[in-house]
Amino acid sequence: MENKELLVKTIKKVYPSHLEAGITWFRFISAINYIKLAKRELELLSYINYRGTISSTSAKQDFCALFDSSIGTVTNMTARLLRIKVLVKEKSKVKVHPALRVDFDKELVIRLHIDTKPNIKTDDADK
């Protein structure tokens, strides 16, 4: 095993609200996992992460008022996010997948390990 130099990058960001921090978090998660999410879907994920669920009518109405959306749009986005497993149902409540939930009352530190493996080339001429 070859020894590689470890490179550490530190970026510190402060956000004015849990919702804005959540939008950035879900933008990051979607980018590293190649999941294309619309701006409104990022907002919905952030809102659900903060509130806990989007299942109640009052939660949907609150989201619609905050982000100038409609109940139909929330329903369609929720269905899509459930389909791609970013949202899950827990006891009939729609919530953010547990692996993606973040409590922004605590400081968040992310450790991302990125490595590369060179392509192994084979000589097809001998076959």
Which residues make up each language-model segment?
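General nucleic-acid-binding
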Residues: M1-S17
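Short alpha-helical segments that sit at the start of domains
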Residues: Y15-Y47
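Short helix-to-turn junction characteristic of helix-turn-helix DNA-binding domains
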Residues: I48-G52
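A short alpha-helical element within helix-turn-helix/winged-helix DNA-binding domains
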Residues: S55-S70, L81
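Minor-groove-contacting beta-hairpin "wing" of winged helix-turn-helix DNA-binding domains
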Residues: S92-D103
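Short, amphipathic alpha-helical interaction segments positioned at domain boundaries
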Residues: R101-K127
